[in-house]
């Protein structure tokens, strides 16, 4: 399933804390890492990994060995036939992901991973601000993000293919965000 997921050009990644139980009943903090395909990918899949830490190295390791994708140029820097995943990675602002978006020092490798911010995480921060402080600015931001979400809902409701949905998003997103 991981090999199929890594054929995607768009992936979503996120990590959430969990409690890991040891053999003697001891408890440790761990994280469940989720990697999901984008909504327009040919496969709808999620791969979960449970790790004892939150280090961004876990995401780097997951993306390290991707099978070749047809018609997609990738940087080869592993064993023959093994290539690092490249594409658009949708993540929150957790610092652990940042190393994925820059070349490795001293190696000169272009990782070809493009950071895509997650609107759900942005929206949650404005929602928390609105609840805590009844912020008028947060209320405006929530309304504009909601209008942005409508672009995607409308595209799915109309059954637009990826190219059509992308064109709509490019045409309608900025005006909706700017109000």
Where are the language model's segments positioned?
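Catalytic center-proximal scaffold of phosphoryl-transfer enzymes
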Residues: 1-179
């Amino acid at each position: 399933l991981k090999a199929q997921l890594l054929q995607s050009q768009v992936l979503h990644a996120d990590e959430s804390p969990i409690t890991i139980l040891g053999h003697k009943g001891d408890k440790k903090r761990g994280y469940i890492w989720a990697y999901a395909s984008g909504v327009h990918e040919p496969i709808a899949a999620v791969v979960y990994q449970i790790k004892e830490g939150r280090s961004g190295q876990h995401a780097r390791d997951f993306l390290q060995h991707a099978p070749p994708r047809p018609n997609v140029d990738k940087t080869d820097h592993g064993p023959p036939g093994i290539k690092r995943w490249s594409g658009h990675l949708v993540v929150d602002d957790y610092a652990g992901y940042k190393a994925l978006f820059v070349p490795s020092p001293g190696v000169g490798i272009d990782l070809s991973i493009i950071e895509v911010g997650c609107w759900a995480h942005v929206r949650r921060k404005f929602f928390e601000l609105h609840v805590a402080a009844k912020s008028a600015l947060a209320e405006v931001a929530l309304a504009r993000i909601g209008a942005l979400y409508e672009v995607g809902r409308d595209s799915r409701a109309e059954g637009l293919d990826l190219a059509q949905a992308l064109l709509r998003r490019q045409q309608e997103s900025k005006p909706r965000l700017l109000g």
